[in-house]
Amino acid sequence: MLGIELRIALTELVVIDRLLKLSDASHQIDHSHFFYKNVDMDYSETINWKEYFSTPSTGYLHLKRICLGEYIEDAIIIISGDKDMIDFIIEFQAESLTNKKINNIKNFILESDINISDKDIEVIYEEY
């Protein structure tokens, strides 16, 4: 089994919503958690990311499945950073991961209208 982390470095806060829409995340949320101004909250499409990341913050969404060119079951999206740099991390498990599958996932993101380049995407995986 492989643990896979797809890390996307973002410098524009508007890209967060674009990535969530691209992956169809809002319809697949099992649970989520964001903490802002000493308040626990669930994900909402109305989150003001500029306000949320005015101080270093982290939130996550646990998804039943996510679409990254193909469906991936049981994924976690971690959104962490501050107003200058955000890490949008997608974690999931797979029995195997070929270079072709990695490239398909990266190309799905790169071919969208989102302002992300190949150098902004890092794929990390470990076998266990």
Where are these regions (language model features)?
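Short, extreme N-terminal segment that most often corresponds to the first beta-strand
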Residues: 1-35, 125-127
